């Protein structure tokens, strides 16, 4: 009994440290993305190079997708330092490709949408953490919704339908609201089931993987909301 009473505070400390690490790395990724996006959008030569050459833009997108798949699928096979570097690199590259939002939307609408997104994200994350309901069953439904969004977005690249784009955005908000709660509960389960004597590098890699999931939820939720509430510069 004495050992249990000693280990419980220790376990709670490990959970808190792990969750704090996840959200810290997520925040670092978001800040880096924002800084890079602002810098690129303010550099006319860079914007012409990136958005004036479709090949370069496509290569950047492919590189980003490759980094996401590498971190998600091979994180256990790489060192903690490599996983951290790839996450930071992905955040920076994402800032490059997302710099277009500062060219397409007014800064006022970007800022206001960010706060709406942040509030929504926090609320969904809190729900995912405190709810007693098992959200595992939502995973398959949400992944089907995500695949549907990707396919519909690719199709709409050819049709360029504003109405279809708006429908995709509303569905996207629903999907990423659900994914935020779902991924937060997964994060909670990961934090509470990690061994007390877990290796530091293993914990770091888990934190990077969790940060990537929440980062993607936040970024995509923000982009969907921006399509709905953003005010065009035109």
What are these regions (language model features)?
Residues 1-234:
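A hydrophobic alpha-helical transmembrane-helix feature that marks the membrane cores
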